């Protein structure tokens, strides 16, 4: 569903990927390169101005503490930074669960604990935290808003929720200077492991533009001044 909102030139998504496997899971294909590349390798090739990382749902487990999750996730993010030091890091909140969901081992309490750990992780490392959960959550129940998760599993976001999420992304920004070096040729992103792209993919000429960072709202949240590499890249996972 993410490719209804982003260009395939600036988004990566892989089924079942986790924050813990961010540095090591090879899932991205590029024209002219054999096999799959890891997220850090992909970011280095795509040379984005910023990345928005959305991981955590696939990490949820009663035996995996919030602090351990954040520690493992941070290692993956640092691998992305090491691969392309000029990139701005934006960590998106884990989306809320539905009040009724198919995997009863997952709890909204744990989602909230993981998100609190992500806030601290970002503060400790100078990264930006995008609190998109606030637009997806029903403040009266603490769960996802009605109609925001699929009725089939109560976990994955609906089109209505994705509309709200991407509106939130576009309207929360904090402008930073583009410090990337001169960009080299960016290879064509041709596929992601276990992901099929439907017919509604957004073209590269109409791609959504993410915020510079996510500390404060700004009326002019769009900036399409990138030349060569994508202005942003979204790394996301799906269960």
Across the structure, where does each feature detected by a protein language model lie?
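Sec-exported extracytoplasmic/periplasmic mature domains
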Residues: 44, 56, 65, 74, ...
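Internal catalytic-core helix/loop-beta-alpha segment
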Residues: 84, 93-96
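Charged helix-capping and loop-helix junction motifs
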Residues: 66-76, 110-114
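Conserved SGNH/GDSL esterase-like catalytic core that processes O-acyl groups on lipids
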Residues: 1-71
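Ser/Thr/Pro-rich low-complexity tandem-repeat tracts
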Residues: 217, 222-228, 233-239
């Amino acid at each position: 569903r993410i490719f209804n909102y982003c260009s395939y030139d600036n988004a990566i998504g892989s089924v079942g990927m986790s924050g813990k496997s961010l540095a090591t899971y090879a899932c991205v294909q590029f024209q002219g390169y054999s096999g799959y590349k890891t997220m850090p390798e992909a970011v280095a090739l795509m040379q984005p101005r910023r990345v928005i990382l959305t991981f955590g749902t696939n990490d949820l487990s009663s035996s995996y503490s919030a602090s351990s999750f954040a520690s493992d996730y941070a290692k993956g993010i640092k691998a992305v930074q090491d691969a392309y030091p000029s990139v701005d890091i934006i960590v998106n909140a884990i989306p809320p669960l539905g009040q009724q969901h198919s995997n009863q081992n997952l709890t909204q309490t744990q989602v909230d604990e993981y998100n609190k750990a992500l806030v601290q992780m970002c503060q400790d490392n100078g990264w930006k935290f995008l609190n998109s959960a606030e637009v997806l959550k029903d403040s009266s129940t603490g769960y996802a808003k009605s109609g925001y998760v699929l009725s089939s599993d109560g976990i994955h976001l609906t089109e209505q929720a994705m509309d709200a999420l991407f509106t939130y992304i576009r309207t929360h920004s904090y402008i930073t200077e583009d410090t990337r070096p001169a960009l080299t040729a960016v290879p064509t992103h041709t596929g992601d492991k276990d992901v099929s792209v439907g017919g509604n993919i957004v073209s590269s000429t109409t791609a959504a533009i993410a915020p510079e960072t996510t500390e404060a709202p700004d009326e002019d949240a769009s900036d399409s001044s990138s030349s060569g590499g994508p202005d942003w890249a979204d790394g996301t996972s799906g269960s």
